[in-house]
């Protein structure tokens, strides 16, 4: 058993009678409606809240806080966290606090703590691989935890190699040898691993140029992110999107200023048309999917509803 449950690794281990000292750390970020910079700006200071501004597609993301939470399943975004991001963003980019906030959201870092500390920022972000046969006299179980997105492949390799060693096999992990898809979604063999580049615009100007050149103005589904009906259908057919959230990841549906208030209804109709033809969805299921999608969008909007944001 390989326990790779992230911030939930401690709970999984506890079900096997093993104690792992996890310290889940909540990180809150905000997105503003304008991509004011085209490069990451990071303040050179001791680790603290709000020290990085990242351009992401058509928006800019300011982050992040680091607050310990007792349960990674239940936490709230506090108003002071949003205010802190605005204040720190102003130091990086004058005028940042006057920009329109689109939403706030948070993730939970899977921090592993062996030593005592009151500050989660003092806990290392390096990944940890635990062999519970040696550590806890529980054979047949490994835990891979902590780490960051940039180290996930290395973590997978370390866990797979130890698992093979435990099972007395000489097979080695190949993740460091496998090719990642190129920016256009192709591997060197020409096989697509993601939607074609027409749906992979990072600037609204790129999408606008594509729409104008293809005379697709009358087919706009998401007016904020300039996603057309063709983009939505391509995500469903080529990208094999099964939910509205799948479509969001492909074409940024509902990620603009309206946060899905208009485009989601249109996209739900298109998704229903395509899935009904293959007997995969009923009207009731699409309505539930629509409700769930808008509920998730609303969660991110609520923390930034004050002042001019109303």
Model-derived features: where do they sit?
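C-terminal catalytic lobe of FAD-dependent flavoproteins
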Residues: 11-14, 19-28, 32-61, 67-259, ...
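Short hydrophobic core segments
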Residues: 1-8, 155
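Low-complexity, small/polar and acidic-rich linker and loop segments
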Residues: 281-310
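A contiguous, mid-protein "functional segment" used to position or interact
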Residues: 261-292
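Intrinsic disorder/low-complexity detector
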Residues: 5, 186, 195, 280-283
């Amino acid at each position: 058993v390989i326990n790779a449950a992230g911030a939930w690794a401690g709970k999984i281990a506890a079900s096997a009678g093993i104690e792992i000292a996890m310290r889940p750390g909540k990180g809150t970020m905000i997105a503003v409606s304008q991509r004011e910079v085209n490069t990451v700006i990071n303040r050179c200071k001791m680790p603290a809240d709000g020290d990085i501004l990242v351009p992401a597609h058509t928006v800019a993301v300011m982050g992040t806080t680091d607050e310990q939470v007792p349960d990674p399943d239940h936490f709230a975004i506090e108003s002071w966290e949003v205010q802190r991001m605005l204040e720190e963003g102003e130091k990086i980019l004058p005028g940042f606090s006057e920009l329109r906030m689109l939403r706030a959201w948070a993730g939970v870092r899977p921090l592993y703590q062996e030593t005592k500390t009151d500050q989660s920022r003092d806990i290392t972000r390096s990944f940890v691989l635990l062999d519970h046969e040696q550590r806890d006299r529980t054979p047949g179980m490994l835990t891979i935890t902590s780490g960051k997105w940039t180290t996930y492949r290395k973590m997978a390799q370390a866990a797979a190699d130890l698992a093979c060693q435990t099972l007395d096999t000489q097979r080695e992990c190949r993740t460091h040898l496998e090719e990642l898809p190129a920016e256009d979604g192709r591997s060197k063999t020409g096989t697509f691993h993601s939607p074609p580049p027409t749906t992979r615009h990072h600037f609204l100007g790129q999408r606008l140029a594509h729409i104008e050149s293809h005379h697709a103005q009358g087919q706009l589904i998401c007016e904020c992110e300039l996603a057309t009906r063709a983009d939505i259908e391509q995500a469903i057919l080529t990208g094999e999107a099964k939910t509205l959230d799948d479509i969001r990841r492909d074409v940024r549906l509902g990620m603009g200023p309206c946060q899905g208030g208009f485009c989601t209804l249109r996209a739900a109709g298109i998704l229903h048309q395509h899935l009904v033809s293959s007997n995969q969805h009923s009207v009731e299921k699409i309505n539930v999917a629509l409700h769930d999608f808008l509920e998730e969008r609303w969660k991110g909007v609520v923390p930034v509803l004050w002042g001019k944001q109303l």
